[in-house]
């Protein structure tokens, strides 16, 4: 709104937030009050970047002060850093950056600070080894319990896992506001709306009007339970929540449309493994050196019965753009859904009452994709592009009957499953035979045994996974200041996630006997 618009609305009695000029007046008053307080001196500073690293311009008052006092020199943090000498801790850090400097020699003369310099020299010369068996028991315990999501953390980098879950170190929090818990909100809606729809006969029996009524009901319920004093929140927060609400309608509409064309039905939500209240027992790996227990929760489990066997698929809601990738699986990453699937195969009978056959895993995009298209795009082209965003990502049992039960048009024109049908009618995509899934289950089991052995042996190597040096997790790691990673120094090394074709992946599993892949 420009100023004329605001004046017109104000004349009509509509209350608006303060205008830009009004806010400027308040800021100037606050600024005047702050500048009038000092009695001896005044230091004015400003950030050059925000918490994400984006460049920031100084506030106008900085330029005003420079014009009022042209003889003042601008000091940068990197020039001199004399202010760091006013406190002992920062001064010692500065001395440690250049051994044998004047500052280093100064602190050498004092017995107390000399001991600190000795400790710094010892730490600088130390090499990252392994934890002793006694240290492992103190840090992790004889029986190590972890969630499935932590498995990916330890496979990404042993040292990062040790810092976060062994030492329980906490990174310095940036001065920024937390983003809204979009994933939690969408999980809540998907679970509760789907459960109510199933109680009313399934998505085929519930039209869109009734479906949207349920969505509204649970949005209001969520706002009342989780967003206290929602009506008193500022206008921007309410706007963002309304926009998220529109996303929720779009996501649930496409989930409903998929399940209307499927014989698989949701059978469990937030199904838990392990813990005191777990529906199913934790996945347990027992070895001579100790035990590893892995628990967690499955967002959704869908099932279909054939020949008295229950075919199950594990569904994970993702508000981001995560894709299932066999290259990651080979490295021990992205195995969370597979772990749950094979655990259900072994333990699911006690919960579902039938023999279990694994039917696959799927990431479901819990987001409303915004398309970037030309202004004169045709409705047909727009629909074709939107269909691409509905494709799930995952790995499915490649039996035609099972795929057709998942999506009735799977063998001719699949819309949701990660499948392709060529002009000759041949089916391809992210599929595997029952034998291949069996070998994959053995591979996941061996990975867990390897992780258990590494934990109990005290492995804390800095060995981050990456596709290239440019995307190494070290660039954004919370523990970089404690790690000092240097590729090739001692046991520090990058582990590259190399691309792999599906046929190569399955061949490696068959020829390697299920041994975890190393690089």
Predicted region positions:
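Conserved helicase C-terminal RecA-like lobe
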Residues: 1-37, 325-326
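Structural signature of nuclease core domains in nucleic-acid processing machines
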Residues: 1, 26, 52-53, 59, ...
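Short glycine-/polar-rich loops that comprise or flank the Walker A/P-loop
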Residues: 38-42, 356-359
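Acidic beta-strand-to-loop metal/phosphate-binding motif
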Residues: 43-47
